[in-house]
């Protein structure tokens, strides 16, 4: 069955190593039947902890469609790519949002904001009482 996947890949930060590893990942994806690529480069970031003695890495997100039967073989091949530090492949789920839930949520936000505004504004009776006392 063909499913839509989203893969987050962490590469070494050096330009040449990054580009070669990214091309290798794309070749493996194509070899296992992935189609409809959408790439999004997040860029170079400092890592929270060292990964394979690297303190910085480049992130790349690739969305693709592929048969679910090939996923295990793909992951086995991705583990062999030298400059790929980490990867995570998730099934992308498109959820439908019902109109009733949106309307209900908007009403709740409106109601909550209205209550907050009423608490922030002093009531007229309190203002009149303060004036009479002075």
Swiss-Prot record:
<dbReference type="GO" id="GO:0019843">
    <property type="term" value="F:rRNA binding"/>
</dbReference>
<dbReference type="Pfam" id="PF01250">
    <property type="entry name" value="Ribosomal_S6"/>
</dbReference>
<keyword id="KW-0687">Ribonucleoprotein</keyword>
<comment type="similarity">
    <text>Belongs to the bacterial ribosomal protein bS6 family.</text>
</comment>
<dbReference type="InterPro" id="IPR000529">
    <property type="entry name" value="Ribosomal_bS6"/>
</dbReference>
<dbReference type="GO" id="GO:0005840">
    <property type="term" value="C:ribosome"/>
</dbReference>
<dbReference type="GO" id="GO:0006412">
    <property type="term" value="P:translation"/>
</dbReference>
<comment type="function">
    <text>Binds together with bS18 to 16S ribosomal RNA.</text>
</comment>
<dbReference type="InterPro" id="IPR020814">
    <property type="entry name" value="Ribosomal_S6_plastid/chlpt"/>
</dbReference>
<keyword id="KW-0694">RNA-binding</keyword>
<feature type="region of interest" description="Disordered">
    <location>
        <begin position="113"/>
        <end position="134"/>
    </location>
</feature>
<dbReference type="InterPro" id="IPR014717">
    <property type="entry name" value="Transl_elong_EF1B/ribsomal_bS6"/>
</dbReference>
<dbReference type="InterPro" id="IPR035980">
    <property type="entry name" value="Ribosomal_bS6_sf"/>
</dbReference>
<dbReference type="GO" id="GO:0003735">
    <property type="term" value="F:structural constituent of ribosome"/>
</dbReference>
<keyword id="KW-0699">rRNA-binding</keyword>
<protein>
    <recommendedName>
        <fullName>Small ribosomal subunit protein bS6</fullName>
    </recommendedName>
</protein>
<feature type="compositionally biased region" description="Basic and acidic residues">
    <location>
        <begin position="113"/>
        <end position="122"/>
    </location>
</feature>
<dbReference type="GO" id="GO:1990904">
    <property type="term" value="C:ribonucleoprotein complex"/>
</dbReference>
<keyword id="KW-0689">Ribosomal protein</keyword>
